[in-house]
Design a protein with these regions (language model features):
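A charged N-terminal "starter" segment
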Residues: 1-115, 121-135, 150, 181-187, ...
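Conserved beta-strand positions
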Residues: 75, 96, 118, 193-196, ...
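Active-site-proximal loop/turn and secondary-structure-junction residues that shape catalytic pockets
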Residues: 56-58, 79, 100-102, 120-122, ...
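Generic secondary-structure signature for well-ordered alpha-helical cores
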Residues: 21, 36, 40-44, 132, ...
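ATP-grasp fold ATP-binding core
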Residues: 136-142
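Conserved, mostly hydrophobic/aromatic
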Residues: 31, 55, 77, 109, ...
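Charged (often Lys/Glu-rich) extended helix/loop segments that serve as interaction or gating elements
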Residues: 261, 265, 269-428
């Protein structure tokens, strides 16, 4: 699909007058419209709810926007629970999916009345001991082996290997866990699974749904447990590369509906509510990292140096992930120069792009790095003493709003404020 910025050069310059680069910027209109498409795609299911994965974009203003559009939140830590509570999410508006869970995290989830999703069979006794067993509870499923989807000339295209993942229970462990939970007072049950990441295929969710729907029928028959909810989790991806095709959420929703009618309805389970956790799909395309070119270097390769670095967007350095780059104001110029676009970390993998064909770039140009609305700012870090950059909301009316200020040296040193010789750093 064609990669178009939601900011023009003039719009970016207007923001820069208030908020220096680098910063992440989010498109409120795009996010709201996308959530409405998701809700429409699954409107056939009366209990449907999107639980936005907080880890994808843990900004309270964004979470409040999503709440207004009917979303819940998917949390996996104490601080994500605290953030969600502060944004007004309570009870079953919260899904708590964690692994190797600390006591205080589990207790907070129980206190908030969140749906608790148990990652392991041993968590049944752990939950009862540290908090209590709620009447409604989920268990996470891991089918093992290799998840395969689609066919090519070479045969099945492998998408992921659940058998190598640390998450979830076997089917027999789930059956045993449901039986124990029923004995301890649980009355309604959910199933959750995540089998593949960032899939660019309308077939993924329907195929996952079929696996979980059949599992639900078997588990209910084996235990007598009332399966009330099935959480398809995340995995629906976005087209980071221009040559990739955008997922059609309406086709995905219809595919899941067909599996629902084919498998659950004949089993007398037509009242099951469907949940999702599409963090990346929900906000990913509606965020960008805006950065200024501050250096150029000409040695064995041509380098463009930015005021942003991997501390502001980790994915290219960590995964070798592709993020499209637009030089604002030069959208219609030929991409006839080959560059490595880099940041200033003392690590050679601090590269936003390698051998990327772009228009001729000059110092002072503004670069728009696409698709940072999920797992962008959220994965920021402080290595090399680099500071987290600001976050800005492009509002529906075209105005902009600071929704997270940039980190300062005082913030960076805050955990050292008890050391006497560090006090000069905190003096105004």
């Amino acid at each position: 699909m064609e990669k178009k910025p939601f900011l023009t050069e003039a719009m970016a310059q207007e923001i820069i007058e208030d908020v220096p680069t680098p910063f992440h910027v989010y498109d409120e209109k795009g996010i709201r419209e996308n959530v409405r498409r998701i809700n429409k795609a699954f409107s056939w299911n009366k209990g449907f709810k999107e639980y936005f994965a907080v880890k994808a974009l843990p900004n309270p203003v964004i979470l409040q926007i999503l709440k207004e559009e009917g979303c819940g939140v998917d949390c996996s830590s104490l601080t994500e629970l605290m953030l969600s509570e502060a944004c007004g999410f309570t009870g079953h508006e919260i899904m708590f999916s964690s692994n190797q869970t600390p006591v205080e995290d589990m207790q907070k989830a129980y206190e908030l009345g969140a749906y608790i999703n148990l990652d392991d069979a041993t968590m049944v006794e752990f939950l009862e001991r540290v908090a209590g067993v709620p009447q409604e509870i989920f268990c996470r499923y891991n089918p093992g082996g290799t998840f395969q989807l689609g066919e090519s000339e070479e045969g099945f295209q492998v998408m992921d290997k659940p058998g190598d993942a640390k998450y979830g229970m076997t089917e027999q462990q789930m059956i045993d866990s449901y039986k124990k939970l029923m004995q301890k007072g649980a009355k309604q049950f959910g199933i959750h699974a995540f089998l593949a990441s960032n899939t660019i295929s309308d077939a993924y969710y329907p195929e996952l749904a079929a696996i979980l729907f059949r599992l639900a029928v078997r588990v209910q028959q084996a235990t007598g447990a009332h399966i009330s909810y099935i959480n398809l989790s995340g995995g629906v991806g976005i087209p980071y590369r221009p040559e990739q095709t955008e997922n059609d959420i309406m086709a995905i929703g219809e595919g899941v509906r067909k599996k629902f009618e084919e498998i659950l309805v004949p089993a007398g389970m037509g009242d099951v509510a469907i949940f999702s956790e599409m963090g990346r799909f929900t906000t990913g395309p509606y965020g960008a990292l805006v950065s200024t070119v501050i250096h150029e270097k000409h040695i064995y390769k041509e380098y463009i140096g930015l005021d942003a670095c991997a501390a502001n967007l980790m994915r290219p350095a960590m995964y070798g992930a592709y993020h499209h780059i637009t030089v604002l104001g030069k959208e219609n110029e030929p991409c006839d120069h080959k560059y490595d676009v880099v940041g200033g970390l003392c690590e050679n993998n601090d590269k936003f792009a390698v051998d990327r064909m772009l228009p001729k770039i000059d110092i002072g140009d503004i670069l728009y790095i696409h698709d940072t609305g999920a797992h962008g700012s959220a994965m920021g870090y402080n290595y090399n003493g680099k500071l987290h950059c600001a976050e800005v909301l492009l509002c529906e009316d075209g105005s902009h709003r600071l929704i997270r200020r940039a980190q300062t040296p005082r913030d960076y040193f805050a955990t050292l404020d008890f050391l006497p010789f560090m006090k000069p750093l905190f003096e105004d």
